[in-house]
């Protein structure tokens, strides 16, 4: 009996060691902290989930991806990009307006009525345009912030408001329209006779309720995903004046710290989320 008990004890100890060594063998060698200033009903969150699942599976667990949604790590584009630069954030998704403070040239994506369709936009963003933008951002951030890819976040921008139907430019007069802190969207709103009002994205719902702003320029999926109709948003003009580019940024040091095969997994992960 004693021999049997001892045998069981040795077996259990051996199994325990094997289990521990298995866990150690599959522990992640790299952790990516990724964030989006949205909620779990937003397509940006969906993109992060696709990225996480792809990267963790394709790397056989060598890379772990932690998701932080909303304002857990940062609340504004400039703050979030600074986090990417200093390494407290590894991956961040922004609109062109959200990144314009650090990289003003990304506002080219907000030029009104520049691209006619999804097909045109996708062809533009899959070629030299994005590679050139990546090189420019690396140079301007002292090689700290890498643009990984440009996808879409919410379709096409449309004007929407809480006050009245907009059928021609004159109907925009006097409306307080939410913008980001960027010259191009603010100048567009001014040109239409409205008043540009910079408001952080997480504060927009409350700003509609309180009347701080009376309109915005967003895609239908953002409007519905953030439940803006519940805050009083009633009128949408489907003018599709700008393609809503999603700029995916990554801390360059974290990216380059990985062996080349894992870098490719990360690159493929960004391709998968588009």
Could you describe each region identified by the protein language model?
Residues 1-12:
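Bacterial N-terminal signal peptides that target proteins for export
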Residues 10, 22, 130-133, 184:
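Transmembrane alpha-helix boundary/anchor motif
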Residues 18-27:
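Sec/Tat signal peptide C-region and signal peptidase I cleavage site
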Residues 27-121, 138-274:
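N-terminal secretory/targeting leader peptides
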Residues 123-136:
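Signature of the catalytic double-stranded beta-helix
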């Amino acid at each position: 009996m004693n021999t049997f008990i001892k045998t069981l004890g040795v077996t259990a100890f051996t199994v325990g060691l094997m289990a521990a060594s298995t866990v150690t063998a599959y522990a992640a060698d790299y952790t990516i902290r990724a964030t989006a200033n949205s909620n779990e009903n937003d397509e940006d969150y969906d993109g992060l989930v696709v990225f996480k699942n792809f990267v963790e599976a394709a790397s056989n667990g060598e890379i772990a991806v932690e998701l932080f949604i909303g304002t857990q790590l940062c609340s504004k584009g400039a703050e979030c990009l600074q986090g990417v630069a200093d390494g407290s954030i590894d991956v961040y998704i922004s609109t062109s307006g959200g990144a314009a403070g650090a990289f003003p040239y990304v506002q080219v994506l907000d030029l009104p009525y520049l691209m006619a369709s999804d097909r045109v936009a996708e062809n533009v963003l899959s070629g030299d345009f994005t590679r050139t933008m990546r090189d420019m951002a690396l140079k301007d951030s002292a090689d700290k912030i890498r643009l990984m890819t440009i996808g879409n976040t919410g379709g096409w921008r449309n004007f929407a408001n809480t006050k009245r139907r907009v059928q021609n430019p004159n109907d925009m007069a006097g409306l307080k329209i939410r913008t980001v802190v960027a010259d191009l969207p603010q100048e567009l709103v001014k040109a239409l006779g409205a008043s540009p009002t910079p408001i952080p994205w997480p504060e927009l719902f409350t700003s509609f309720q309180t009347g701080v702003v009376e309109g915005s320029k967003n895609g239908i999926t953002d409007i519905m995903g953030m439940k803006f109709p519940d805050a009083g948003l009633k009128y949408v003009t489907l003018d599709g004046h700008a393609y809503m580019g999603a700029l995916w940024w990554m801390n360059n040091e974290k990216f380059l710290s990985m062996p080349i095969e894992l870098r490719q997994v990360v690159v493929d992960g960004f391709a998968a989320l588009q």
